[in-house]
Regions:
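Beta-strand-rich binding/interaction modules
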Residues: 232-233, 246-317
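Amphipathic alpha-helical substructures
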Residues: 176-264
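Outer-membrane beta-barrel initiation region
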Residues: 294, 304-305, 316-427, 431-432, ...
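Hydrophobic helix-coil surface modules that form long, contiguous segments used
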Residues: 1-99, 128
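Zinc-dependent metallopeptidase catalytic helix centered on the HExxH motif
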Residues: 86-146, 203
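Acidic/His/Gly-enriched intrinsically disordered linker/tail segments
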Residues: 6, 117-194, 210-211, 215, ...
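C-terminal outer-membrane beta-barrel translocator/porin domains of Gram-negative envelope proteins
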Residues: 366-368, 428-439, 445-449, 461-468, ...
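Strand-connecting loop/turn motifs
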Residues: 196, 231, 359, 388-390, ...
């Protein structure tokens, strides 16, 4: 058997004696469809033939007449698609997939592109024309989503240029993103630069001139420059061979009355290396006018004429320049609150945060909780966000009403969080400042963390961090007995960690080390009654986790922990010791449901477990010590899995065991309990849910084995040997 074809540079074949065949044509192009038995409903009855004809009609309109006599659309074994001259292999008969794969026949086959050397000129190009097809049929949003994703990668410093030769990408994931998505964005930006009509003529001229010939970047650029009449050398260099960020802002603005209306001068300021012409819109009282900057200079003046009085100036309102900071692209004339910027204001439902590319959001939420000192506490919280990564700030004002309590402590509290301001942007960095005066405590926490991943889909993810924390208790009526001593603490902590997957195991290791001081203006001994309390302390922890699935329904989790926190000659203040059962008091300080005496999840009849410390889940949360080593084991069996549901997405049964040992034989400084060996084991049931963007779980646990601390001079442990506590969690408290 001999196969013969002219004007092709690739070859493929597919053979299956069980194939079903249907045929048709588009003009003088024969259409052959081969599909697998059992897929008649999806492929047969002319479905795949008609969709292939529709794809040919679309592509002929975009580029020009199909240059070969036939096209074969073959149903392949797995999903996705593959392209060859006069043949496409499709995992389904989806119209968009057929348009994409058949587009390769034009852009890789007829325009003979070397995909190994310049994949963007094939994969990026056909992704672009597929998006045009989707938009022509009323399906929008794909290109905008890709733009936001790619800009995020640029901000994280993980992008690679679209023009690299295939083997030079650091991994297959980066290759796919760069030549498909970044390649597609290049063509969208070219269309923005030259205009839609010129872009259409570029595509048809390029196809007509180079069909059935070998093509490269130079061939396409020459056509684009000839048709548009523009020098595109810089644009091609930036769009294909770099990953430079773009950021323009509005500088000064002036408006004046003219004989025909109003003239507005706008200073366009370039703040990042990326250069692209920027649309400048002036919104008047009854009309809108636009002009375009050159975009090359650091500062450039643009004049816009309107008939009515100008009210507002916008840069790039259509989000076509890939400007990463759109918050500085708007200015209004006159005085306006919030700096003259528009914000998307919404009623916060807690479970979801709207994220926009072109403006920030601010959500408002009334809050209510309870504690024994202030009673029912009412407040108002706002939280903001830009781009899902910047200006993630929170402001909360709350106050106790004295309702439902005999103590009637009226206290106005404030909490402010500033997170990731735009002006501190740095790849992989997260900056957070908390300042608070809440329920008998005031202080501040400043933290900086950097994460780094050499590869996007595999390999280790490393993080390093620095945190400065200052906390002072000032009203003991709010404090949980046995968790605080009457001293302020200030400490500096360094942290480092790594997460990775090795075979079936998801592994993690994190360590912290730091030190600080405890103080009280009345003197430590007078404030605490302890003559042994050293003003200086050191603190270090090391945590390792290992998690794997044993089968589709079984999962095993392991955790090891070691921690030490002590003064120069012995124990440090209670609030900075190592806690046996979970998170320590300072880790819980931002959660009003876990913060103060009598809080909803900190009552004697409710047990909420917030992971941390030794994770000895059967113990009273006030049990602490200077040094502890602990191990946790968990075996989980899924009994119900409904991934598409919102409530009870997954229900599982779990058995757990925890063991810990105090490194030094010591007594708890407040309760007097002697602490040495601790252990617990039990079983529980978990249910996982998802509301909005938030996944959470609740669980009930039954400790069946429990080793209490040895009796001392203080009160007995709160936990009894057998108990069914309620644990409601908005984050996982599993050991890993």
């Amino acid at each position: 058997v001999i196969w013969y074809a002219e004007d092709v540079h690739h070859f493929a074949m597919s053979m299956n004696p069980d194939y079903r065949y249907e045929g048709g044509h588009w003009g003088d192009v024969a259409i052959h469809v081969l599909y697998q038995p059992g897929d008649t409903a999806a492929w047969g009855g002319g479905v795949a033939v008609q969709r292939t004809a529709k794809a040919l009609e679309w592509l002929d309109g975009v580029f020009g007449k199909f240059a070969w006599p036939q096209i074969s659309n073959v149903h392949r074994i797995e999903g996705g698609g593959t392209e060859f001259p006069m043949m496409i292999h499709d995992g389904s008969a989806d119209q968009g997939l057929i348009v994409h794969e058949l587009g390769h026949n034009y852009l890789m086959g007829i325009l003979a592109n070397n995909e190994w050397r310049e994949g963007w000129l094939d994969e990026g190009f056909t992704s672009y024309q597929t998006t045009l097809f989707d938009e022509a049929n009323g399906h929008f949003g794909g290109a905008a989503g890709d733009e936001a994703f790619l800009t995020g990668m640029d901000l994280d410093g993980t992008s690679e240029p679209a023009s690299l030769q295939s083997e030079y990408y650091r991994d297959f994931t980066s290759y796919n993103i760069s030549i498909y998505s970044r390649g597609e964005q290049f063509f969208h930006q070219l269309e923005y630069l030259v205009g839609g009509e010129s872009m259409h003529r570029i595509l048809r001229t390029y196809y007509d001139r180079w069909k059935l010939k070998h093509v490269d970047e130079e061939a396409f650029r020459d056509v684009a420059e000839e048709v548009s009449g523009m020098d595109l050398t810089g644009f091609f260099a930036q769009g294909l061979h770099s990953t430079e960020l773009t950021d323009y802002t509005i500088g000064r603005k002036e408006r004046k009355k003219t004989d025909s209306g109003w003239s507005t001068k706008v200073e366009v300021v370039r703040k990042s290396p990326g250069r692209v012409p920027v649309e400048v819109w002036v919104i008047g009282q009854s009309d809108t006018a636009a002009a375009r900057s050159v975009g090359l200079a650091e500062r450039e003046w643009v004049t816009v004429e309107t008939r009515s009085e100008p009210k507002e100036v916008l840069l790039d309102p259509r989000v076509r320049t890939r400007d990463w900071d759109m918050m500085n692209n708007q200015k209004k004339f006159g005085f306006h609150p919030l700096g003259g910027r528009d914000y998307d204001l919404y009623l916060d439902t807690y479970f979801s945060t709207p994220v926009h590319r072109d403006e920030a959001t601010i959500g408002f939420l009334p809050t209510v909780w309870y504690n024994d000192a202030g009673g029912i506490t009412l407040g108002l919280r706002s939280r903001s966000d830009y781009f899902g990564r910047f200006e993630q700030n929170q402001f909360l004002v709350s106050g106790g009403t004295g309702w439902a309590t005999d103590e009637d402590v009226l206290d106005l509290d404030e909490y402010v969080r500033l997170r990731n301001p735009v002006w501190l942007r740095s790849p992989g960095m997260t900056q957070t400042l908390d300042v608070f005066n809440v329920e008998g405590r005031y202080g501040a926490v400043l933290s900086v963390e950097r994460t780094h991943r050499p590869h996007l889909s595999f390999g280790p993810e490393r993080e390093v961090g620095l945190r400065l924390r200052w906390v002072v208790p000032d009203d003991a009526r709010f404090l949980v007995p046995g968790e605080f001593e009457d001293v302020g603490t200030a400490e500096l902590e360094l942290s480092a960690g790594v997460r990775d997957r090795q075979g079936p195991w998801q592994l993690g290791l994190k360590g912290t080390a730091g030190g600080g001081l405890v103080y009280n203006s009345r003197g430590l001994a007078n404030a605490t009654g302890r003559n042994d309390l050293d003003p200086y302390f050191y603190r270090a922890t090391l945590e390792g986790t290992a998690d794997r699935t044993l089968s589709p329904r079984w999962r095993l989790g392991l955790r090891g922990f070691a921690g030490v926190s002590a003064g120069g000659d012995g124990e440090t203040a209670k609030q900075r010791q190592i806690y046996a059962s979970g998170a320590d008091p300072l880790e819980r300080i931002t959660n009003p449901f876990l913060r103060s005496r009598g809080a909803p999840l900190l009552r004697p009849d409710v047990y909420y477990h917030m992971a941390g410390g030794g994770n000895l889940r059967g113990y009273d949360p006030t049990v602490s010590m200077s040094a502890l080593v602990a191990a946790n084991l968990e075996l989980e069996r899924t009994v119900l899995d409904r991934a598409q549901k919102k409530l009870f997405k997954r229900v599982s049964l779990a058995g757990f065991g925890d063991a810990g040992h105090a490194i030094a034989d010591e007594d708890d400084p407040i309760t007097g309990r002697n602490i040495e060996f601790l252990a617990d084991a039990g079983a529980g049931i978990r249910a996982e849910h998802r509301l909005g963007q938030t996944s959470f779980r609740h669980s009930g646990r039954l400790p069946v084995l429990y080793q209490p601390p040895r009796p001392g001079s203080g009160p007995a442990p709160r936990r009894r040997r057998v108990r069914l506590p309620l644990a409601l969690q908005f984050r996982s408290s599993m050991v890993v």
